[in-house]
C-alpha cells in the first residue's frame, strides 16, 4: 500500500504579485506553474485563499503525493521560478501530514 503525503504550504503574496494585473497573474500560472505540475503528475495541488482570515499567510497550497522525490522536485522547480525569485510569494510555513496516520500505527501494534 502506498502512502499519501500531504503538505499544507502557507504562502504570503508579496507586493510584486499584487501589483500584477489579474491577466498577468493567470498567464504566469499557466506558463510557469502548470508546466511544473504537468512534469510531476504524482503531485496534486489545490489552492486556498486565506487573506481575509489570516495576517500570516494569504494563501494555502495543499500538495498531495505518493512520491516524496517528486514533491521535492516540484518545490525546487517552484523556488527556481519567478514565484520565489522575483519574488511573487514567500513560503511562510510547510506543514507535512499523513492522513489518518494513527490507523497505520495502531495496526502495527
From Swiss-Prot:
Domain of life: Bacteria
Pfam families: Darcynin
Family to which the UniProt record says this protein belongs: Belongs to the darcynin family.
Name of protein: Darcynin 2
Native source organism of the sequence: Acinetobacter baumannii (strain ATCC 17978 / DSM 105126 / CIP 53.77 / LMG 1025 / NCDC KC755 / 5377)
